[in-house]
């Protein structure tokens, strides 16, 4: 019954969010330490592929989320050469986390459905079941204008297909992507 009520609540929140004025299209994910393309000097060219958050030889990436239940990337590339890799999640919207909160949770692709189901009842722990062994890493739940980071060991991604998603109820169907281990 709790899951049913949670799903109804998520649907109501999703419908309310969808009725909002659409935001501008999301910019590409920016590696940490670099200015977004819109802030870069005119002489610098923006990367051509906005579909992935590249590791680009460094050990950090930034993923943006918004009030339209979107991440600005569908692929986070993690370099095998890194001892640690940090992903910063930025919520570029304005709505509070109670109505349009986002997190970024990494798990094996085959485990993600279970992570979602167990997360629905875990509002007090940012919609992530406490001590869930299936979760490689996750950020805290954030609202508009906030950010949160996670740090992981890339070696944990060596044995399988991994995904990232927002586990706020109703968001995972739209807010998800692949985590790719690269050379």
Swiss-Prot record:
List of residues binding Cu cation: 102, 166, 171, 175
Keywords, comma-separated and alphabetical: Cell outer membrane, Copper, Electron transport, Lipoprotein, Membrane, Metal-binding, Palmitate, Signal, Transport
MF-aspect GO terms: copper ion binding; electron transfer activity
GO cellular component, one term: cell outer membrane
Cited PROSITE patterns: COPPER_BLUE (PS00196), PROKAR_LIPOPROTEIN (PS51257)
Subcellular location: Cell outer membrane
UniProt cofactor note: Binds 1 copper ion per subunit.
Lipid-bearing positions (S-diacylglycerol cysteine): 18
Annotated Pfam families: Copper-bind
Keyword Metal-binding belongs to the record: yes
Required co-factors: Cu cation
Signal peptide: 1-17
Lipidation (N-palmitoyl cysteine): 18
PANTHER family: AURACYANIN-B, OUTER MEMBRANE PROTEIN H.8
Name by which UniProt lists this protein: Outer membrane protein H.8
Organism: Neisseria gonorrhoeae
């Amino acid at each position: 019954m709790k899951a049913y009520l949670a799903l109804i609540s998520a649907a109501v929140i999703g419908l309310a969010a969808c009725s909002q004025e659409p935001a501008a299209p999301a910019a590409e994910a920016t590696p940490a330490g670099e200015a977004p393309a819109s802030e870069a000097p005119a002489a610098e060219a923006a990367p051509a592929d906005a579909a992935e958050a590249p590791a680009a030889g460094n050990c950090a990436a930034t993923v943006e989320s918004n009030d339209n239940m979107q991440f600005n990337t569908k692929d986070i590339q993690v370099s095998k050469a890194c001892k640690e890799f940090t992903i910063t999640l930025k919520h570029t919207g304005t709505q509070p986390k109670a109505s349009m909160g986002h997190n970024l949770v990494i798990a094996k692709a085959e485990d993600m459905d279970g992570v979602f189901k167990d997360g629905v009842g875990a509002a007090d722990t940012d919609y992530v079941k406490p001590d869930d062994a299936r979760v490689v890493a996750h950020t805290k739940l954030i609202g508009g204008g906030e950010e949160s980071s996670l740090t992981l060991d890339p070696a944990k991604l060596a044995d399988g297909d991994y995904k990232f998603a927002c586990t706020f109820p109703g968001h995972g169907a739209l807010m998800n992507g692949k985590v790719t281990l690269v050379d």
